[in-house]
Amino acid sequence: KALQIQALQRWMGPGRSTTSGDDLVEAALSLAKQGWTEFVLKRPFSTAGGGMKRLTIEEVLQYRGKGMSEKIISEGGLIIEPAHDRILDFSIQYLIEGKEIRQLGLIEQIISPSGQYLGSLSFPKFCSGMNPDIAQFLMEKVLPQYANNARFTESLRNWAEERNFEGPLGVDAYLYRDSSGSLQHRTACEVNPRFTMGRVALDIRRQVAPGHGVCLEIVKAAKLPQRDESVQLLDGRLASGSLVLNEITPHSHFAARIRVAKQKRSLESFDIPTK
């Protein structure tokens, strides 16, 4: 993540990798001069929103004079960036083969208020079921930035080529509202050069009944129903119901589950798992 910020800062926005408490405070004060009052602090290597804190400027100042562990420094330090009032998280799934990059689809990401990943929603039409103002903003201002020939996509391809990377790649992004309430867009908050949960959701959705959507989520194993939920098929493909994707043992804490429905509102309820 630290290297991504350095290489793709034009698209990822203001953020900085820090390797000491004083460095962190300096970065926060610099962001505060730009009008930011809250910040997100995160580890360079973390998954599903782990290792993330939301802090005020007063809380960041408490790091003055403090050091960081050798492990954190070896990872690239702690990353600090402005905290946004996010209203829609999503990911863009690409495939890089040779010198070609191709967009495969967009996935809505479900993120808890604390930044914890809860699940991915994949529907044939990405903007279906969204508020009209958000859908219009997406179609007119946002989605064109991820087209195969867009500047961001070309920058992403160059970034991957410089690192000799080929294969699946997911970009996390989001919409937020600024202090005036206007919609804003962060083109990229993280680049994941691997098979992501969003990519898995996209591939699964292509195997269910036409016109239907999929929710891929992580749930507590203890909350799973004692009996499998009934499923309905349409022309041999899953059209409704849910399926657990991994084997559940007495020692299982979490499970990966898919839910299928034709209407997005049928899939928008989530439990927040805890340790």
Per-segment meaning from a language model:
Residues 75-77, 82, 103, 114-183, ...:
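A long amphipathic alpha-helix within ATP-dependent nucleotide-binding catalytic cores
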